[in-house]
């Protein structure tokens, strides 16, 4: 049975994990790291770089490098590169393809099935966009799982049979979630979840960038925001400073040649940022995590003293101010330090993949929908059919009627959110039910059914009870991608995968050819410079020289088959040279032996290693017969 992987598709970094003998293993990428930067770059030579290679060239290729694309999932955002538009699911698919390749290299087999995580507070549009990204990457997405739920699954499964309440505080690179779960006897049940899809480590970085821009403007009078390369260097320096301030009280930010003044003299940025100053300029961001926490506690109706464990998820929770706030909110409870905040979500996703594949037994995951779902009714009111924190999958129906006499159709507008006025919530989609027979208002009965699947994706049906006519919508407007769009993107992704494979093959062949040319040239040079001259005829060496020249000429072009052919010919000539050297050495040895027989000078000494003695191998302690 083909294996399934668990993928944490993060804003800043992504991780892939797989079950090995029932235990989750985090897969290292081709660069040797267990986390892959969620960055995609389009090099000017047409190559698509993903992960650390993309991050390494970001400063010199700002306009063609995409980071934090997760923040655009479910929107109509796109970026144009070389005249072609790329949507957020397409960019995310590049990251997923890289993780897929790394997992396949580790396992030595093809991967198609995956469980992908999303922030718990992602709406339907964002979940659908994530599923589309998986599909474009060539993955069969078994399930979309909430990140805090995956973390609790990874943390809580081995904590015994006793029922426990776990609070997961998840602050990542771009999103924030807090969830309260109950775990016991193999059942993982989410009681409530809340969050902010636009709050994460990126925002802390931006505050440091703004602080540096203001400081530099104050000392030099130059506004760095107009210089894209300078801003990219500031972003990287800000992230580094934030990380350093988690373990130090202050950090130096030194960026030489950040820009030039009016006289073209180079200017340097050199600032000292203390942890106290960093916490001061980011305090309001930290305070934004309080409301979702309080919302979860209120929704579950339990007190903080009843929480058994607090689990921190996401790299941003390493900031001391975040840890201190969590301790304050939970009444002094010490957060659990036994999990890796960068990897625990992917580990939980791999466990859920194991559950769905039957590798992990006796585990039931009960997740919830993070936001209420409903339709717009008369007066623009949001009428909820499914309340937030309802366990999924779920199905709810409610009967509505017409607002006007002889109304021939009804427009069903589906919203997600907590506001009382429908227009203030997120419009997921709309559809029309037509063919309603003429009747006074209030007489027709229209049954509206909401069905949320295990991925948290919504299906809505409207049915006229009188005629039996019905219409259904599967909410897809969020990603803005039709089936045709997705199919086209899958083909594009496959084409790029083939291009990438060819590029890798070409690089391997070139490397082999260059190595062979270098070694052969060195060998020929040694022969010509040998004491007493070369042992082989000059015409043999000339043939090798010609083959080397042919290989160099092929390497100067782009025809991979010509390089292979030249390398093959050079290999043959090199072998012929080796054979000639061996034969020359053998002939010289025989000539020397004939001139100096026995123990004479130049001959073999009696008892030397050249004497051959017949003997039997015998066990120790026994005589030879």
From Swiss-Prot:
Stated family: Belongs to the heat shock protein 70 family.
One cellular component (GO) term of this entry: cell surface
GO biological process: cellular response to superoxide; chaperone cofactor-dependent protein refolding; chaperone-mediated protein folding; positive regulation of plasminogen activation; protein refolding; response to antibiotic; response to copper ion; response to heat
Cell compartments where the protein resides: Cytoplasm; Secreted, Capsule; Cell surface; Extracellular vesicle, Bacterial extracellular vesicle
Region annotation (Disordered) ranges: 586-625
Ranges annotated as biased composition (Low complexity): 586-598
Keyword Chaperone: yes
Family annotation (InterPro entries): ATPase_NBD, Chaperone_DnaK, Heat_shock_70_CS, HSP70_C_sf, HSP70_peptide-bd_sf, Hsp_70_fam
Keywords of this entry: ATP-binding, Chaperone, Cytoplasm, Nucleotide-binding, Phosphoprotein, Secreted, Stress response
This protein's name: Chaperone protein DnaK
Stimuli inducing this protein: By stress conditions e.g. heat shock and oxidative stress under control of SigH. There is another promoter.
Function: Acts as a chaperone.
One Gene Ontology term of the molecular function aspect: heat shock protein binding
Organism in which the protein naturally occurs: Mycobacterium tuberculosis (strain ATCC 25618 / H37Rv)
Domain of life the protein comes from: Bacteria
Residues modified as Phosphothreonine: 175
